[in-house]
């Protein structure tokens, strides 16, 4: 299914059932893109485990509202480099320089 691998940017819900958690995570990560991922669960251990394993910049758990002005917006892989929004977004417009002086 192309909607699994392409960012379609439309009002589409790509829903599928999986036999195992590992199968679901593998299918979600089988793409060269990784802007956002979404899943539903009531199991806190599973929520943290799956959220860490998903190769995407934003994860929505039981919610689709992952983009607000105070949260970092950005993806992994070919879905963008860097973050917009939040204090992390300011880092994209900054140049950090270390100047180390030895004994003068």
Question: Where are the regions a protein language model picked out?
Answer:
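Conserved C-terminal structural/oligomerization subdomain of aldehyde/semialdehyde dehydrogenase
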Residues: 1-104
């Amino acid at each position: 299914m192309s909607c699994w691998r392409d960012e379609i940017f439309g009002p589409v819900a790509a829903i599928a059932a999986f036999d195992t958690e590992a199968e679901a995570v593998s299918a979600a990560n089988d793409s060269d893109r990784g802007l956002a991922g979404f899943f539903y669960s009531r199991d806190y251990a599973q929520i943290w485990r799956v959220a860490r394993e998903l190769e995407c910049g934003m994860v929505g758990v039981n919610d689709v509202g992952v983009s607000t002005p105070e949260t970092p917006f950005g993806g992994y892989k070919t879905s963008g480099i860097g973050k917009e929004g939040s204090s992390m977004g300011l880092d994209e417009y900054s140049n950090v320089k270390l100047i180390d002086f030895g004994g003068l």
